[in-house]
Regions:
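Phosphate/pyrophosphate-binding loops at sites that engage ATP/ADP/AMP, CoA/4′-phosphopantetheine
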Residues: 1
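Beta/alpha (TIM)-barrel catalytic core signal, keyed to glycine-rich beta->alpha loops juxtaposed to Asp/Glu
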Residues: 11-185
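Acidic/hydrophobic-patterned starts of short beta strands in beta-sheet-rich repeat architectures
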Residues: 5-6, 37
Length: 185
């Protein structure tokens, strides 16, 4: 019995990287964990862990969706004086690509930390119009298109979808076969 992937959820200001490394090493040596990752860590926090763990961090799970993508917004607004140009995550997406760390998107249908789901939300009429149009074109649901949007990014982002609804899970799984064009993205 083992865990495929064990994540450290959220950074800890009092974390001692050497202690984490020792725990990682023990769990891996005992065959209890196959791989390690983090959630919501910036590049320097990952560097601290990787220095102590000899590069054990294989995954960084971040909040990411078509309606919540500040890591992309910051890159598109370089040298522009607006809020979207503020780099709040240390270029985590680019960093993970450079270091071959898999990015996983949690809450792929959410538009903020606690605000809710953007699909069908009155706050996102234009986005929902596009999602519905593309869903019809690709014979799927808006959820499927939202996941296809994430999968289209060249970083190879994986989505974490929590659902008890088999139909939703089936629709989301079909997103792997949808390749949005640049214009659709």
């Amino acid at each position: 019995e083992y865990v495929d992937l064990l994540l450290l959820h959220r950074p800890d200001a009092l974390m001692e990287p050497e202690e984490v490394a020792e725990a990682f090493d023990t769990l891996k040596t005992q065959g209890k964990v196959r791989a390690f990752g983090v959630s919501n860590h910036n590049p320097m926090q990952i560097e601290l862990l990787n220095q102590a763990t000899k590069g054990a961090v294989e995954v960084n799970q971040i909040q990411f969706s078509v309606a919540h993508c500040p890591t992309i917004d910051a890159g598109l607004n370089v040298n522009i004086q607006n809020d979207a140009g503020c780099n709040r995550d240390g270029s985590v997406l680019e960093y993970c690509r450079l270091k071959n760390i898999t990015v996983q998107a949690w809450s792929p249908f959410q538009y903020g930390m606690f605000e809710g789901i953007f699909i069908g939300s009155e706050k996102y009429p234009k986005l929902n119009e596009v999602l519905n149009r593309l869903a019809e074109k690709y014979n799927t649901t808006p959820n499927g298109i939202a996941v296809a949007w994430i999968l289209r990014h060249p970083a190879g982002i994986q989505t974490i979808v929590g659902t008890m609804n088999e139909k939703r899970l089936s629709d989301v799984a079909k997103a792997a076969d949808i390749v949005l064009t640049r214009e659709e993205w």
